[in-house]
Amino acid sequence: MIRAFDQLSLPLLRWLDAEDAHRLAIQGLKLLPAIKPRPDDAKLAVRAFGLNFPNPVGMAAGFDKNAEVPDALLRLGFGFVEIGSVTPRPQSGNPRPRLFRLERDEAVVNRMGFNNDGAEIVLRRLAGRANQGGIVGVNVGANKDSADRVADYVRLIETFAPVASYFTVNISSPNTPGLRNLQQAAQLNELLSKVLEARDRVRRKAGDTPVLLKIAPDLSLAELDDVVHVARSRGVDGMIVSNTTLARPNSLREQLRAKEQGGLSGRPLFRLSTRMVAETFVRVEGAFPLIGVGGIDSGGAALTKIRAGASLIQLYSSLVYKGLGLVESIKADLTSTLLRTGRDSLSEIVGADAATITAEDWPV
């Protein structure tokens, strides 16, 4: 079914404007039959953040911003789905065009600006799937015109706690002016303090929902030191490394499109994001797990990210070029690697190459 979907959809979607193609893909997923996914090999199971993931391959935030198709994505083989980013109030985001393919680089530049339907509508959709099972995280962000961004995050934690498998506090999008300033130590300390207090207030009715922090790949190592220190001292449950980058690697071939303002994702982000996973892993010292995201487009790339320090991984931009069949391909490659090396689980290789990667020259 997935192969047929890719064969029919990929050629058509590539002819469309990138954002129109995304909208059509969402509508197409709504039409897929509700078929149970093939069970995952037990070797792929991951225990992280107090949750049991059937496999380590997740759909990153940004694809299903409004919780329209989380169950369709789970049926296609994802081990978990992250919806959002969601803001308290609906917002339209930045003017179009705001999403650009860099075809020859297998990359994407976006400046979407947290366009979403708002907390009320997204909550209604998630509440409607409450009995479906599966891990569905909620990525939360602040409204662009908010007078108190910390209060926005607190409100979203309180709102979505009954329906979220986990939360991702997104302070690393480059497309909301000033948002990345929340990664600075003093501001981050205040934010996490209030977010975790909010989580604890609703614990009795919603359980102990894990809270993860998503960071930018453009942090300096000194800034990363501060972020990890605050995250550990405040007791977050994990981190996602990383969001899109404002940098433009020297290797880019689509130079004209690369000049578009916004965050770069896809294959050119792989080396930088993987380096940041490794740098974060050595600083975390096992205090909590990491989710690695950025440029994963094959089983080999997924394995590299895991060996850099990621317990779980997420995809998005690579699906634009490889199709949804990439999910099963990555899982098959990871299973084959475990069988070939005589290992029982991926946890045995998480961070195996972190020290080596952090000793390499910085990616440019």
Curated annotation (Swiss-Prot):
It is an enzyme of class 1 (oxidoreductase). Its EC number is 1.3.5.2. It is a peripheral membrane protein. Its cofactor is FMN. Keywords: Cell membrane, Flavoprotein, FMN, Membrane, Oxidoreductase, Pyrimidine biosynthesis. Its main location: membrane. GO terms for biological process: 'de novo' pyrimidine nucleobase biosynthetic process; 'de novo' UMP biosynthetic process. InterPro entries: Aldolase_TIM, DHO_dehydrogenase, Dihydroorotate_DH_2, Dihydroorotate_DH_cat, Dihydroorotate_DH_CS. The active site is at residue 173. The keyword Flavoprotein applies. Catalyzes the conversion of dihydroorotate to orotate with quinone as electron acceptor. Monomer. This is Dihydroorotate dehydrogenase (quinone). It comes from Bradyrhizobium sp. (strain BTAi1 / ATCC BAA-1182).
